[in-house]
């Protein structure tokens, strides 16, 4: 959420930022003007309400003086005035809450402002590659992951559909174990070498948590909601970031770095017809998440560090990848800047996203009221938040299957994962 004071003072800059994100000039200006008008109405109302409260307080004091002077008529007149003001104030306080909610809702729907070095563009075609690691091999016999998995008898989409419908997968045997091994390897790397603290968070959260990280109110159609009103997490970013909601942290203890391996649940409402075969786009999938809570001065360096931590996963696995910086039109709602890491899939003959690492500034912190106090400071400041995939486990499984497939249909297990697989070096049909 953006600071309304900043919006008032930088209206044209916000319009420009919204245009960079793909909004038309008229829509962008309407968004900004509506927020400023709502704030003006709220401030005007607050002034009137404060004046009424001052009048009530002054009249209440005069009642005592009138009674002391024996002027009962004046005292009764003042009592009537106080009663009238009391009713006005009660109505005014209700209106104040409505105006607060109106402004909050408008601000909650305005996306974050891209940093100056983010490339301006419309969509993924305008993203800019910044580095490429590893050789993208393309054997002429390469198959896609679902062909490999079904041929091995370890990946079952038909039974998954019978159980749950489209966009689900049943993994069995050594392929299920390989996915588990990937998640364990990632957690071990991030906790023992990268300094992240492992967390096992709830998978069901309240509205406030999703508001804090920016999924609500704008993107509710992308989520699954339970009958009791809780939401299934679309990413562990939600519970991990909200650990500091409504807290004032000790600045000396920043940065806080959290990681979690959780299932994630997404409706994929806007993905009809995309990646309908295989595991690339599922309603349920595992992901290792990285979250950092830091101060403004350290946030950009932390962003580079987090991205390097995610890249290290792919380096250790021996998977070719490239890292791109997203353009303004392709960035997420709450991000100031995002790096996507895309892994090479020889079966698809292309790179596909496996991690997205974003710096959000104080955008989420304002929604969560998450602050810190630096040593010697009386004033608490908003923290800066970052999040990234470290990495998507299901997509890592796909990448291992396609990059380590053999011409006979077997899958060689990356050396780094063999200890997690009981020393197994290859997955074959009998697995």
Curated annotation (Swiss-Prot):
Kindly name one Pfam family recorded for this protein: tRNA-synt_2b
Give, as one word, the top-level EC class.
Answer: ligase
Primary residence: cytoplasm
- The EC code for this enzyme is 6.1.1.11
One MF term from GO for this chain? ATP binding
Q: What does it catalyze?
A: tRNA(Ser) + L-serine + ATP = L-seryl-tRNA(Ser) + AMP + diphosphate + H(+); tRNA(Sec) + L-serine + ATP = L-seryl-tRNA(Sec) + AMP + diphosphate + H(+)
Residues recorded as binding ATP, renumbered to this chain, are 266-268, 353-356
Keyword annotations for this protein, in alphabetical order, are:
Aminoacyl-tRNA synthetase, ATP-binding, Cytoplasm, Ligase, Nucleotide-binding, Protein biosynthesis
Spans traversing the lipid bilayer? none
Protein's cellular compartments: Cytoplasm
Read off the PROSITE patterns from this record: AA_TRNA_LIGASE_II
Q: In which pathway does it act?
A: Aminoacyl-tRNA biosynthesis; selenocysteinyl-tRNA(Sec) biosynthesis; L-seryl-tRNA(Sec) from L-serine and tRNA(Sec): step 1/1
Gene Ontology BP annotations:
selenocysteine biosynthetic process; seryl-tRNA aminoacylation
Which InterPro entries did the record assign? aa-tRNA-synt_IIb (IPR002314), aa-tRNA-synth_II (IPR006195), aa-tRNA-synth_II/BPL/LPL (IPR045864), Ser-tRNA-ligase_type_1 (IPR002317), Ser-tRNA-synth_1_N (IPR015866), SerRS_1_N_sf (IPR042103), SerRS_core (IPR033729), tRNA-bd_arm (IPR010978)
What stretch or stretches form a coiled coil here? Answer: none
Per the record, GO CC terms? cytoplasm
Q: Where does L-serine bind?
A: 235-237, 289, 389
**Domain writeup:** Consists of two distinct domains, a catalytic core and a N-terminal extension that is involved in tRNA binding.
Extract the HAMAP family matched here: Ser_tRNA_synth_type1 (MF_00176)
Write out the similarity annotation. Belongs to the class-II aminoacyl-tRNA synthetase family. Type-1 seryl-tRNA synthetase subfamily.
Quaternary data: Homodimer. The tRNA molecule binds across the dimer.
What the protein does comes down to: Catalyzes the attachment of serine to tRNA(Ser). Is also able to aminoacylate tRNA(Sec) with serine, to form the misacylated tRNA L-seryl-tRNA(Sec), which will be further converted into selenocysteinyl-tRNA(Sec).
Protein's recorded name: Serine--tRNA ligase
Q: Which gene encodes it?
A: serS
